[in-house]
Amino acid sequence: MKKVLALILVALMMLSLFACGKEKPVEYQPIDPADAVSHKDHTSVYSEIGSKVTIDMVEEDKETGLAYVTVDGTKYELGMDFLSMAMVYNTAPVGNKTSTDVYNEWWKLYIQRWNYLVPEVPLYSNQYFDLYNAKIEGLVTTPYWGPADAIVAAKVKTGEANSVILGSSTDLSGAFRDSAFGKSSPGASDLDIQKLTSGYDTLMSDKNGEYNWNMSALAEVPTSVVNEDGTITYTIKIKKDLVFSDGSAITAKHYVAYALANSTPVSVAAGATGNAGLKLVGFAGFAAYTGTNNGETTDKGVTVTKYFDGIKLLDDYTFSFTYTADYAGYYYSIVNAAASPVPLALYLGAKGDVIVDPETKACGLNDAFYATEQKDGKDVYTVAAEIVANLKWNSALPYSGPYVVSNYDASSRTATLKLNPKYPGDDARGKASIETITYVKLVDETQMDMFQKGQVDIIAQITGGDQTKAALKLVDENPEKYAETHYDRAGYGKLGFRCDFGPTGMTEVRQAIIYTINRPEFAQTFTGGYGAVVHGPYYPGSAAYLATKDTININQYNYSSDSAIAVLEAAGWIYNASGKKFNPKKDDVRYKKLSGYELSEDNLNFKSVDNKYKTVKIDGAYYMPLAVNWYGTQPNPVTDQLLTAWQNNPAATTAIGMYITYTSTDFNKGIYGEFCRSKEDGYDGTPKLNAVNFATGFNSAVYDFSFNWTIDPDMYDNYSTAYIMDEADFFENYKK
């Protein structure tokens, strides 16, 4: 009896404690990697039904703007991979709609889904002002034609020193020969140097972003023929008098070397994607060739071949590319004949060479290219290390364009270029005459002072109210010394997301973030009235936008914490750290119970960089905190403004139950290291970044993002622009 009374007394005491608000501490269980869930089948919807779908079959949800199609009795939601591919490969005329009409319809649906998914937050789209020394004549810039293009045709006034100093706030890295090698996108400044040192392209864009044949390099206009099997062949013949900067002759081999080498496992070993010839006939068989397995069959049923059927060398100055039927209907078909010459050793090594099948004229690469050696107990391709070394700016290889790199100072991020007297000029840029171009690093806070001291002659893409006003004032007061040119920017400054990791891997979180940044105010403050806001990846002056602006259905995400809370709660962000219902009066951060493919290994191990919040396991269920790890590039006035407008804004944090960490970073470490997860740029193997601010631009009239939304894991790391695999694109999600 005493024991029973004692138990009753203990129970009453416990009830009394709980009645006073004392709750039993929650017990977190260890994270179990075995609980992770991932897709096993990455077959895309587009690969399965894309060829069956025409634009007239598509249904558009008038409220959300999302697109659907029914094929063989199954209704599919069209994801980003599908729409980006259909936009450029499914544009055959339908009914009274032209190919352009069809393209515009796909483009609209693509923009609308992008707007729904919010893979990034456009913060401002501004006017750009290019400020330059008045000694420079004929400098004409446009949204598609930057100073690195314009300076080639420009001249220096007689009597002035025949040299120009270009400046950019984007760091140079020294990757001048192939600025995109091993990256998902090139560094803007590195790309400028690459443009200035490259030439003899078969195709070049003009000041309006339109592509035209470069007859300065071509012997005749390229031809195209649709073959009986639906493939399409482009035949290109170059002139016989083209030479590199060292005077060595350029032949057709130099035009096909890049596509050949970068479709092999050797280039992959050097850090390339290995997908340069992906759209060409015979790619799979050639890409599987290792140097010793010709004629074998891969585990995917592909017959390995030493020669690439889609690339042929017809004679010393004539070559052809044959595209598979899937890509024969490409909307921007002219670019299929685009090619540029490279020194053979750049990608083939000292002993590598292009070889030709005497019967078919198909190209391959010699045995020396595939040679291996022992390193650390493993067979490695010898040429892979040569490629890495040859890509350095100061390798002994020549350049093909109007300038050559004579020096690069990595400590000051300064490149010096000298005129290449052997380059005759081209149709787009003309012939260069400026003897020396120096490319320097600029910082917003000091660039105007450098300009007035003559330490830089051109400051490109000035933006921001204070900087713009200072530049215009300088020109107004000193018209004999300074000049400017300006244009509406085809692009925008943004807060980009890593959309496959942590809370920003979920659409509703990205929507909540865009709801809680007052973007019109941000744009007005930053640009000083010289800009506005866009709501997707488009240029308001583009033909597609102008054709669809009256019917496009996009959410402007007007500033509202209530709207943010609504989308979060609807998606399940309704818990606290104990797995109980979130109480905004006493809980700081919301949590979501993860399910399905949200239970990725990275999400199970997610935590804020300050270790304050992390995914927790309670009674077998996983709960993720609404914490965002933001990396802000510095020095950068956009970062400074985001600190106020977003990270330290109660409407974006405490009001909605979100926590935001801030990590200051330089551009290369933040973008390439943490965002792109490049170990060469400092990534340590542990995912951390959820958001980072940078910019995007549409530098050509060719609007093509096919493959940039791929769900193919073999292409994802190198091609994905926002690191998102749209669930609507997985064919397995529709299997009954």
Residue ranges and their predicted role:
Residues S16-A19:
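C-terminal motif of bacterial Sec signal peptides marking the signal peptidase cleavage site
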